[in-house]
């Protein structure tokens, strides 16, 4: 039993707590009703913290005021700061609210950037279903904003970030919204200049036995320059640097190109072919630390006028994605004093929304995913699959696959929690080797209350 003296000592420790934890710290929110919990997490987000429903890995705890002596003592023992709502209510000024996305017949606004929308023509465009799973959170819309600025200013734009942070999707989505045709080329270590600018290929339509058995195939870049398409070069730094340097004149302002591989046809000002007004070029890549990546020359990097390095998602972003999939609700976020949120979309898995246990399950899935992703190669080092030459990878795609399976199993009449365990077994557990690695994943499941 906690004595009155212990209670007073604990209270004095709390009262002398000093400054708030650093921005970006994970804060465990506990002891509140659901309505109070939502209000508390909102205040934490406005103040720059990362709220979580789980104690594991938290730097601080947010509790009702006054906090109990047990909470204070436990937090002091773990080196965890104790916070109450009053610390944030006074400082949190209600930000101005704006819709994160606005589409009219002739324009698209992404955050604070408005770009032109082409006349209606569905030919060559990606279908809307391609983007049904998108969660319009701060990271994704910031990337899309960079793409929109590049499109408006006719500047080459590169997006760099970890696997599955929606780099390519951001470019293709903006192109889709603008009714702009985009062509995508996945580069690799075997890519050559022929894929980019053109090469001679067999002329299969020519009369058999004719000496003119070859024709010049125009590569993806000059073809896009001629017809006004957007070019998306995926995995840019997997290609050899000398191959990429062939694009240097295309990245200049204004863009140009000489097809020396053929007849010397010149694209650009004063040339044989005018570059179409709507031509744009984009690139995506993983950081150079990834295996097999080339180090790009400073001169080549400098030619990409806009270069955006994207943040990797954390528990907050994964949880928002799950909410989007099940409820169709996009998250609110604050940038530069403005609170943004996109209008609700059709949920991808509406059959899950009616189960009263779903929100608690989504909390657990998000925390579990973050735990295994970090163990497989987070900032603190690899603890899962340490002896393997090829590390395990758990990304947004992993979670999307698990949720798709979960929804399908529930449709077949399987109980929600049983379906969740089955989906996780198939997508996560079977991905790792039996033995210590699989035991570690099961342990992560038990930590969030899902395992047996």
Language model: regions and residue ranges:
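DNA strand-break repair and replication-stress modules
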Residues: 1-100
